[in-house]
C-alpha cells in the first residue's frame, strides 16, 4: 500500500477530487494548510502599514491506496492541479506498512 500526499492550490481541489474519483479512488482526506516554497510571499497594506505575508493558503490531500493505483493517481493529480505557475504544489508518495479500520478491525487493503 502507498500513501499519496499532495499539496495543491485551494481552487484546484474540486478538479483533483473528480480526477481521483475517475481513476477509482473512493476516499480522500483534505486539510487546509499554509506554506511557502519558491512562490514565497507577498506584501499587503493594512491601515497604512506594510505586512509581509509569508505563508500562502494551500490544501493538503492524503489518500492511501493499493500499489497498482499509484501511477494513475499521481498522473490524475498532476493533470488536475497543473496551472503552469509557481506554487502548483508537490506530490509525495510513501509506503504504508499497515492499515486498520477501527470499526471492524479489518487490516491491509480491506481496511482502505
Segments from the language model and where they lie:
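Positively charged, small/polar-rich N-terminal and surface patches that mediate targeting and assembly
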Residues: 1-112
Amino acid at each position: 500500500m502507498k500513501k499519496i500526499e499532495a499539496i495543491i492550490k485551494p481552487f484546484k481541489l474540486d478538479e483533483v477530487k473528480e480526477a481521483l474519483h475517475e481513476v477509482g479512488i473512493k476516499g480522500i482526506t483534505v486539510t487546509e494548510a499554509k506554506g511557502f516554497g519558491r512562490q514565497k510571499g507577498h506584501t499587503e497594506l493594512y491601515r497604512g502599514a506594510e505586512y509581509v505575508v509569508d505563508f500562502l493558503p494551500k490544501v493538503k490531500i492524503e489518500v492511501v491506496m493499493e500499489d497498482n493505483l499509484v501511477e494513475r493517481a499521481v498522473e490524475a493529480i498532476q493533470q488536475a492541479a497543473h496551472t503552469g505557475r509557481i506554487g502548483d504544489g508537490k506530490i509525495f508518495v510513501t509506503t504504508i506498512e499497515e492499515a486498520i479500520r477501527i470499526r471492524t478491525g479489518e487490516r491491509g487493503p480491506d481496511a482502505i
